[in-house]
């Protein structure tokens, strides 16, 4: 592994870890940063699958007490059974739409301009959601009904558009549907587990010919870096939301999206050429 490749792996692994669970779109940031670093092609596709697994492992590790509690209680405890049912219900819409439209969306929408527009629009929606009166009807994830889970699962499908943010859509959707900020955030984290693992397994099998043994050091380093930075991001977000709203992330999305659009409009960066590279 040469120094340039090492640099790209460290940057992309850190970007994935930091952005995967913040409501600012990890896919959008990966598209932008990968284009700037000229890291594309089949190797990059395989690399992205691996680093996403590193990020999701961080959430599994962080919430392992809750996971063990659910697994242990599944045979007899109604709370564990209801929580598992809600996760499956919320996961189902993404499975259907992902299988049907993932390739089409990747072909036509995975470009920096789509990301920029989605960042701005998502930021505006996030600001609106935070400023409206928030009536809490579900204070804890264990109190969710199946209808709450289904609505959040449908909203999660919006994240198939790069720049929207899976965590952003599920968290803000949860707030709009009456979940407390803590419940919406925790359910978003738990929903990420089957969603991201399912997507990674599906993509990994579909593009299995892209994985080469010679890339193992690159993949391993990216996996570890993504895990470390995702752990930092998850713990930081859980502490942050205890006393803050998501408005900070909304303004960041808007500013970042407008910056990308400005560089495109004034010709400072040829994003069309970058996306095609």
Curated annotation (Swiss-Prot):
Listed EC numbers: 3.6.1.27
More details: Bacitracin is thought to be involved in the inhibition of peptidoglycan synthesis by sequestering undecaprenyl diphosphate, thereby reducing the pool of lipid carrier available.
Reactions it catalyzes: di-trans,octa-cis-undecaprenyl diphosphate + H2O = di-trans,octa-cis-undecaprenyl phosphate + phosphate + H(+)
Domain of life: Bacteria
HAMAP family linked: Undec_diphosphatase (MF_01006)
Keyword line: Antibiotic resistance, Cell inner membrane, Cell membrane, Cell shape, Cell wall biogenesis/degradation, Hydrolase, Membrane, Peptidoglycan synthesis, Transmembrane, Transmembrane helix
Function: Catalyzes the dephosphorylation of undecaprenyl diphosphate (UPP). Confers resistance to bacitracin.
Family that this chain belongs to: Belongs to the UppP family.
GO biological process terms on file: cell wall organization; peptidoglycan biosynthetic process; regulation of cell shape; response to antibiotic
Stretches that traverse the bilayer: 43-63, 87-107, 109-129, 183-203, 214-234, 254-274
Enzyme kind, highest EC tier: hydrolase
Membrane topology: Multi-pass membrane protein
Gene giving rise to this polypeptide: uppP2
PANTHER family given in the database record: UNDECAPRENYL-DIPHOSPHATASE (PTHR30622:SF3)
A GO molecular-function descriptor: undecaprenyl-diphosphatase activity
Localization terms from the record: Cell inner membrane
Name of the protein in its database record: Undecaprenyl-diphosphatase 2
CC terms in the record's Gene Ontology section: plasma membrane
């Amino acid at each position: 592994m040469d120094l340039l490749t090492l640099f790209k792996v460290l940057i992309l692994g850190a970007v994935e870890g930091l952005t995967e669970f913040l409501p600012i779109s990890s896919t959008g940031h990966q598209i932008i940063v990968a284009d700037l670093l000229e890291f594309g092609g089949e190797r990059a596709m395989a690399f992205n699958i691996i680093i996403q697994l590193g990020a999701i492992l961080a959430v599994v590790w962080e919430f392992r007490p809750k996971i063990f509690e659910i697994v242990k209680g599944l045979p007899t405890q109604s709370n564990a059974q209801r929580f598992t049912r809600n996760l499956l219900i919320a996961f189902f819409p993404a499975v259907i739409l992902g299988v049907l439209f993932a390739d089409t969306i990747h072909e036509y929408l995975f470009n920096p301009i789509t990301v920029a527009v989605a960042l701005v629009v998502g930021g505006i929606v996030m600001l609106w959601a935070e400023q409206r009166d928030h009536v809490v009807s579900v204070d804890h994830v264990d109190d969710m009904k199946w209808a709450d889970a289904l609505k959040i699962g449908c909203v999660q499908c919006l994240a198939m558009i790069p720049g929207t943010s899976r965590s952003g859509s599920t968290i803000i959707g949860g707030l709009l549907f009456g979940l407390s900020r803590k419940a919406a955030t925790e359910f978003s984290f738990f929903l990420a587990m089957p969603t991201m693992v399912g997507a990674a397994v599906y993509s990994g099998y579909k593009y299995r010919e892209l994985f080469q043994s010679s890339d193992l050091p690159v993949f391993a380093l990216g996996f570890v870096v993504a895990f470390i930075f995702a752990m930092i991001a998850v713990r930081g977000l859980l502490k942050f939301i205890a006393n803050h709203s998501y408005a900070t992330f909304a303004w960041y999305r808007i500013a970042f999206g407008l910056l990308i659009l400005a560089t495109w409009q004034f010709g400072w960066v040829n994003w069309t050429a970058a996306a095609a590279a």
